[in-house]
A protein has these predicted regions:
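Glycine-rich, proline-tolerant flexible connector loops at the mouths of alpha/beta enzymes
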Residues: 1-18, 72-76
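Catalytic-core regions built around general acid/base machinery
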Residues: 9-24, 88-98, 159-160, 201-205
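The substrate-binding groove and active-site-proximal loops of carbohydrate-active enzymes
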Residues: 4, 8, 36-45, 190-193
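Active-site acidic/histidine proton-transfer and metal-coordination neighborhood
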Residues: 20-24, 37-139
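A short acidic, helix-capping loop that chelates divalent metal ions and anchors anionic groups
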Residues: 2-4, 37-41, 75-80, 145-148, ...
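Histidine-acidic metal/acid-base catalytic patches
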Residues: 42, 116-212
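Short, acidic/polar
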Residues: 17, 46-57, 150-161
Length: 212
């Protein structure tokens, strides 16, 4: 019997999930519940928040270290991102308030084509929520590296890690290439070290922090 939706997950299924991973010594770093937290439709946005809050209630039962989401499903332009930002702030505040009630952790993932798109907006979110214990981050360098910043990665990664490093619960490691036109349309995944991401600064930070 599978799991069809968030509304009908049982404690028995959560225990099966936890024990199955534990038996093979596999940690559940992120219990994913990726939702559109900035949907302009208030009803859909409320349902997305409710889904994340429901999964936060299962975090400990499932053995997850945090519950994670991005802030949209869509590839948004700058105007669309700005228009959705207040909805995103409100959604995340409600989610973190729910996390605090069960001592869970919500980890949000910045993406440059989503409303949580930059260091400046992340700082605004941190200030708005003001709960370092229950608001953490998933850091995916590939999702915050815009074409114009490719030559400036050492500073970029140091800036990101200075801001959110103490709250990073997971780092996604991958690589990609841009085509000759340097546009998003020519993005292509590739093996680590074969693309444009320079991991030296991130690797150095990980060793300095003694992070797993």
């Amino acid at each position: 019997e599978g799991i069809n939706d968030y509304q009908h997950i049982s404690p028995e299924q959560l225990e099966t999930l936890r024990s199955g991973f534990s038996a093979h010594q596999v940690e559940i770093s992120v219990l994913g519940c990726y939702q559109d937290l900035s949907d302009p439709d208030a009803e859909k946005r409320a349902a997305a928040v409710q889904n994340v809050c429901r999964v936060l209630g299962w975090q400990h039962l499932a053995g997850g270290h945090c519950v994670g989401s991005e802030t949209s499903y869509l590839h948004l332009d700058a105007e669309e991102r700005a228009a959705r930002r207040e909805w995103m702030f409100d959604s995340i505040l409600r989610i973190v308030e729910a996390a605090a009630k069960t001592d869970a952790i919500f980890a949000v993932e910045p993406v440059y084509w989503h409303p949580l798109d930059s260091l400046e907006v992340v700082q605004q979110l941190i200030d708005h929520v003001a709960d370092p214990e229950h608001l953490h981050f998933i850091f995916d360098p590939a999702n915050v590296l815009e074409n114009h910043n490719i030559p400036h990665q050492a500073k970029l990664w140091n800036d990101w890690l200075s801001l959110i490093g103490s709250r990073v619960d997971a780092i996604h490691i991958k690589d990609f290439t841009y085509g000759s036109t340097g546009t998003d349309d020519t993005y292509g995944p590739c093996p680590l070290g074969k693309g444009c991401i320079q991991y030296d600064a991130i690797s150095k930070w990980l060793h300095q922090q003694n992070r797993d």
